[in-house]
Amino acid sequence: MKFMPHEYQKYAIEYIKSHPVTALFLDMGLGKTVTTLTAIRDLMYDTFEVQRVLVVAPLRVARDTWPDEIKKWDHLKCLACSVVVGSVPERRRALQQDADIYIVNRENLVWLYENSRLDFDMVVLDELSSFKNHQSKRFRAMKALRPRVKRIVGLTGTPSGNGLMDLWAEFRILDMGKRLGRYISQYRNLYFQPDKRNGMVVYSYKPLPGAEEAIYHQIADITVSMKATDYLKMPELVSVAKEVSLSEKEKERYDELKKYLVLELPGGEVTAANAASLTLKLSQMANGAIYTDDKDVVTIHDRKLDALEDLVESANGKPVLVAYWFKHDKDRIRKRM
């Protein structure tokens, strides 16, 4: 497919190319991934400024979204990627591949830092808010890796879903403490005051008057922030298909019920009496659970729950309305969320 960038995408691409440190805050639907990949391609094959790029993302985004975007767009097909997920042997094999871009899920960043001898001259953090906890192992691993990296891009839709305090860790990774300070205590003392406390024990902080404007001013020179409502003429509703894939075993069960109208499961037998019943049973299986003939619920997979969890996380505190088909869908969603 031919990529026809919007003007805001052209601006963001050039911004990444001209800024060694970039915080790119784009709403859902504004094309963060293809924008970043286009900048990577230009830096790699036009100006020859980078040779090896590391992308850190949530598991399903790392495994599916980034590789799919590279395959989707004609101008990106020159980029070779290796997806570093799965078991330790699978990850080791992925790192041994000759690639332009290595894509790792954030849960394996610590492992990558401790076990990989590869040098990366550019890092992309897809969902920068994953690094808002300055006490997490992944934050410490990225903090240690950061001085060896020439270029870094942080992607997110909503950078401070839980307030301004989150920004410190995110920008500590990006600019190594240049703008908001090297230490969280320094940042707190400068921009916040104690809120809820019990004697000398402080449970929460609130921004000082004018702190928000001062913080945004400090990070403005490396930040691009765009909202979909400002840059896209959008209809009242935009439908985006979020596909999930079943494992071989899950697909075999689905096909067996579809073909024979009966399926033996550990939790009981499932029978479809007619075409209408079969459609309902297959819909249940696609959603992840199914009612047996005895009205018990048997879980088949969590694929849609995993995808929903990613969507809720990317909303970063914004309201999300979730519709469900079956009662067991509601129960499983509530249990997961």
Regions found by a protein language model. Name each.
Residues 1, 18, 31, 35-41, ...:
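Conserved Helicase C-terminal RecA-like lobe
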Residues 1-25:
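Conserved pre-motif I regulatory segment
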Residues 35, 50-72, 161-166, 325-328:
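Conserved Walker A/P-loop ATP-binding site and its immediately adjacent core
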Residues 52, 78, 122, 130, ...:
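Conserved P-loop NTPase motor "coupling/switch" region that bridges the ATPase
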Residues 60, 81-91, 107-111, 132-135, ...:
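Conserved helicase motor
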Residues 61-86, 174-177:
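Conserved helix-turn-beta segment of the N-terminal RecA-like "Helicase ATP-binding" lobe
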Residues 88-122:
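Conserved helix/coil segment N-terminal to the catalytic DExD/H
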